[in-house]
């Protein structure tokens, strides 16, 4: 068969297959055009999930008759001229309108601000139906009907109307986040009207509109610069996380992208603070010279290619980690709201309530008494952060990492307001510390909190090369499968840097000769078995630092004060004081919250006093 030139309509339909995959793709292109035209108000209306109708109206600069005639031709654009090295607009290829016009019924009515009247052009299946004068307000109205009527095979690949409408909503949300100074309105026959009023330069207010007040209450501001690249935005505290990555938003020079490099950097920044299977919530905006990024690498312009990807990744990871360290003792405020919903009592007459038998141990009228002294058996303790237990002989003098825990001070009632986490008032179920704050109370998970403190102390000592070890008087022998022994011995050098000295002890056995001094007495058998299981899943490409911190987190869990252990009031207060000055203390090493805060106003609502 001879080679021949394809018709313009067929060329546009081929292009539409790449650019216009679904109604949301068309909505994205039309909203980008409106933003490039300088619009401050954009209204989107849909019907049938955008398949029957998609209308985008704006108050931008508008077009005259000559512009309209060119706008529906392929590769006609006002946004670039001779180079792709300086793209400062969202659109630039001149493909969207001709692609849409080739597969749908398209009409565009537009009027320039300084013109007395407007014009309208109509296209169906790639054929121009008319170009004529029309009454129009300044700006542009683009109406798309019967999307893919000219290529009916494409309709079979679309999802339900509800799913397609949801995809359009997500596009509008992303655009609204990127452009807070623009008012967005989304309406449709199959949806309630969604409106985002303009917030000017107040990005956090726009976040609250789009992502909800929960995000704005749990967000930490980002503002960092590295060389010629700047990063702004907001990152959620680690305990404010979700079950998928749909709540991660990235923008490059105002362009919404779903770039793998950026998403990977976000995961890396939260690697030590969020449990497996959970995802952080973040909104990142990267600004850089257009010459340093290629936006012409994907038909939908959703991916970009940075000239220096390592610099961008380092900027993102560093900025988020610095922000978390700066404000890292915060925990998500949503936990208190969830607790309020769970505990809000339904009204029930007193006489109809089931009566539990009275017990001296459980009665609320039993006066508070200090917890009994610890058992004589040595355990992980707060002092263990800086003092080895009696059963070990330190190899060299331990570094006093946490003086606040080693020298606890009582908290007088009148000084409660000086401390963010308040003063300990009780321990319940030998696991949770109840503290009174100036305007409410805090409930602390003692094991999760101490685990984080131990981990941060180990990491600090590790980075300063002053991590003390303790020589065991009698080495602990741990029997494990031979393949686990092999894996452990491959990483013996990494363990040694953390104060854990191991060696072979015959077939299927490991001898533990030294443990980190700050952990006190450690369950060596449990620790070694857990390490053997976990290092089997290590990424072989991970650096030494990442591996050491991974091991430190596991050790911290085994060396922390356990659930079920009674604490004295001064020990509880010591834990609270150390949490207040320790980065990341709002969540444990597995990403769970270490404390929940209840405001006095929340408590009063429980009793109907608000």
Swiss-Prot record:
Residues 351-406 are annotated as: Disordered. It comes from the Bacteria. Signal peptide: none annotated. One of its GO terms (molecular function) is ATP hydrolysis activity. Keywords: DNA damage, DNA repair. One of its GO terms (biological process) is mismatch repair. GO terms for cellular component: mismatch repair complex. InterPro entries: DNA_mismatch_repair_CS, DNA_mismatch_repair_MutL, DNA_mismatch_S5_2-like, HATPase_C_sf, MutL/Mlh/PMS, MutL/Mlh/Pms-like, MutL_C, MutL_C_dimsub. CDD domains: HATPase_MutL-MLH-PMS-like, MutL_Trans. NCBIfam families: mutl, PRK00095.2-4. Belongs to the DNA mismatch repair MutL/HexB family. This protein is involved in the repair of mismatches in DNA. It is required for dam-dependent methyl-directed DNA mismatch repair. May act as a 'molecular matchmaker', a protein that promotes the formation of a stable complex between two or more DNA-binding proteins in an ATP-dependent manner without itself being part of a final effector complex. This is DNA mismatch repair protein MutL. The gene is mutL.
């Amino acid at each position: 068969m001879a080679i021949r030139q394809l018709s313009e309509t067929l060329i546009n339909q081929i292009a539409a297959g790449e650019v216009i995959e679904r109604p949301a793709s068309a909505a994205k292109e039309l909203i980008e055009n409106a933003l490039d035209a300088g619009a401050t108000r954009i209204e989107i209306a849909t019907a049938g999930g955008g398949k029957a109708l998609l209308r985008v109206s704006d108050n931008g600069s508008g077009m005259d008759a000559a512009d309209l005639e060119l706008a529906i031709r392929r590769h006609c654009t006002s946004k670039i001229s001779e180079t792709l090295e300086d793209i400062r607009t969202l659109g630039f290829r001149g493909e969207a309108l001709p692609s849409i016009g080739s597969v749908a019924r398209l009409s565009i009515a537009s009027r320039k601000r300084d013109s007395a009247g407007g014009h309208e052009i109509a296209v169906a299946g790639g054929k121009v139906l008319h170009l004529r004068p029309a009454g129009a307000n300044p700006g542009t109205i683009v109406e798309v009907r019967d999307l893919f009527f000219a290529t009916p095979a494409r309709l079979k690949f679309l999802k339900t109307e509800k799913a397609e409408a949801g995809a359009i909503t997500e596009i509008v949300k992303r655009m609204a986040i990127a452009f807070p100074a623009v008012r967005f309105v989304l309406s449709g026959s199959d949806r309630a009207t969604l409106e985002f009023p303009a917030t000017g330069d107040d990005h956090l207010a726009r976040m609250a509109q789009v992502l909800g007040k929960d995000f704005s209450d749990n967000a930490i501001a980002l503002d960092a610069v590295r060389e010629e690249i700047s990063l702004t935005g907001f990152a959620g505290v680690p305990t404010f996380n979700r079950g998928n990555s749909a709540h991660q938003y990235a923008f490059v020079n105002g362009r919404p992208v779903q770039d793998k490099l950026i998403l990977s950097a976000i995961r890396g920044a939260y690697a030590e603070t969020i449990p497996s299977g959970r995802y952080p919530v973040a909104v990142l905006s990267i600004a850089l010279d257009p010459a340093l990024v290629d936006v012409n690498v994907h038909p939908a312009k959703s991916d970009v290619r940075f000239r220096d990807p390592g610099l961008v990744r380092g900027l993102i990871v560093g900025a988020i980690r610095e922000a978390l360290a700066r404000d890292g003792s915060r925990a998500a405020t949503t936990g208190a709201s969830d607790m309020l919903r769970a505990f809000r009592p339904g009204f029930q007459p007193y006489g109809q309530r089931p009566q539990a038998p009275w017990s001296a141990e459980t009665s609320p009228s039993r006066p508070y008494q200090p917890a009994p002294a610890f058992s004589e058996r040595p355990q992980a303790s707060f002092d263990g952060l800086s003092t080895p237990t009696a059963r070990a002989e330190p190899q060299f003098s331990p570094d006093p990492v946490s003086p606040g825990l080693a020298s606890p001070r009582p908290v007088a009632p009148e000084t409660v307001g000086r401390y963010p986490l308040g003063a300990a008032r009780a321990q319940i179920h030998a696991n949770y510390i109840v503290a009174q704050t100036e305007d409410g109370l805090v409930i602390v998970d003692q094991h999760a909190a101490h685990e984080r403190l131990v981990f941060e102390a180990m990491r600090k000592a590790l980075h300063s090369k002053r991590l003390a070890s303790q020589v065991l008087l009698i080495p602990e022998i741990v029997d494990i499968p031979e393949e686990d022994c092999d894996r452990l011995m491959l990483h013996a050098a990494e363990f040694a840097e953390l104060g854990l000295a191991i060696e072979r002890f015959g077939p299927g056995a490991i001898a533990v000769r030294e443990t980190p001094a700050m952990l006190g007495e450690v369950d060596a058998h449990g620790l070694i078995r857990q390490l053997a299981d976990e290092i089997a899943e290590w990424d072989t490409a991970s650096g030494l630092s990442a591996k050491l911190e991974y091991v430190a987190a596991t050790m911290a869990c085994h060396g922390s004060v356990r659930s079920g252990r009674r604490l004295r009031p001064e020990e509880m207060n010591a834990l609270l004081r150390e949490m207040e000055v320790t980065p990341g203390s709002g969540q444990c090493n597995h990403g769970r919250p270490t404390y929940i805060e209840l405001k006095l106003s929340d408590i009063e609502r429980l009793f109907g006093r608000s």
